[in-house]
Every structure is written in C-alpha cells, then in structure tokens.
C-alpha cells in the first residue's frame, strides 16, 4: 500500500494479468484461471481479485495468509466499508486494540473508520474472502 501511495496509483495497478476472458465474459465473469494475482513477495501473503473490474461499487478479494504471516504491525486503513469471511484456516483479526480469533465459516464487518491487522498464527494457510465498497484497492 505504501508503494502505491508513493507512486500515486492504486495497489490494483500492480496486479499481474490473468489469462484473457472468454468472449462475452469480460466485465461479468471471473474464471479461476483468469484472476488477477498479487503476490506480496517475502511476506507469505497472496491475493487474487475476484471482481471482474474495479469500475463497480464492490470489490471481492481472496487473500491467502501462509502460516506465521499477516498484514504487518501498522495495520491497514479502510477507505470505505469492508467485511470478510474466513474460507479456511484460522485468522487473528486485530481491531482497535482487541484481538478476535476467527475460524472457517466465521465472518466479520469492519467499522468504517480506523485500521485493522490480520495474522495467521496457525500451522495451516488461512484463506479469507474480503468484500469492500467502494471498489478501491
């Protein structure tokens, strides 16, 4: 996020392109093989964009946190509303000084203001579906 801010671009600008969408699917359907991917090298965090574009109001991202990895100590600030669903594994969610342990199937909604941190303290990868609005990444 800091690099994107320094370059005055969104983080999505750095996403690697997946393969080309089939005719008639562009902007509507995202096949697993066509997802835009972002690997935070050396951090153990990998993200895939599930939304067909950033031109809408909602953004879907799938984040995979390797064991012992997270978003860092500083936390991430939100630009709007954000919620998530733990698809697999265990995730520590830190909000305003409180720690919540979330397991597969648990969901959460983050307050509009403030910041949050995530950490995977388990021995298995944690996969989280993030939903945010507006669609800014």
Predicted regions and their residues:
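Short histidine-centered beta-strand/loop micro-motifs
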Residues: 72-77, 119-121
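Glycine- and acidic-residue-biased ligand/ion/polar-headgroup-sensing regions
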Residues: 78-96
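Ligand-binding loop in jelly-roll beta-barrel domains
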Residues: 45, 54-56, 103-104, 112-137
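Charged, helix-prone or intrinsically disordered regulatory segments positioned adjacent to compact structured domains
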Residues: 9, 18-45
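A short glycine-rich, His/Asp/Glu-containing loop-to-beta-strand
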Residues: 32-74, 130-132, 136
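Short acidic-glycine-tyrosine-enriched beta hairpin
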Residues: 50, 96-113
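Hydrophobic micro-packing sites on short alpha-helices
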Residues: 1-7, 11-15
């Amino acid at each position: 996020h800091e690099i994107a801010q320094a370059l005055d671009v969104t983080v999505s600008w750095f996403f690697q392109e997946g393969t080309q969408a089939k005719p008639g699917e562009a902007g509507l359907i995202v096949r697993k093989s066509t997802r835009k991917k972002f690997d935070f090298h050396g951090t153990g965090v990998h993200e895939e964009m599930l939304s067909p574009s950033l031109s809408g109001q909602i953004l879907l991202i799938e984040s995979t946190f390797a064991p012992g990895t997270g978003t860092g100590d500083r936390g991430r600030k939100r630009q709007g509303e954000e919620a998530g669903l733990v698809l697999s594994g265990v995730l520590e969610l830190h909000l305003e000084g409180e720690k919540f342990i979330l397991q597969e199937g648990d969901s959460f909604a983050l307050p509009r203001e403030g910041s949050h941190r995530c950490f995977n303290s388990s021995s298995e990868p944690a996969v989280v579906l993030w939903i945010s609005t507006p669609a800014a990444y």
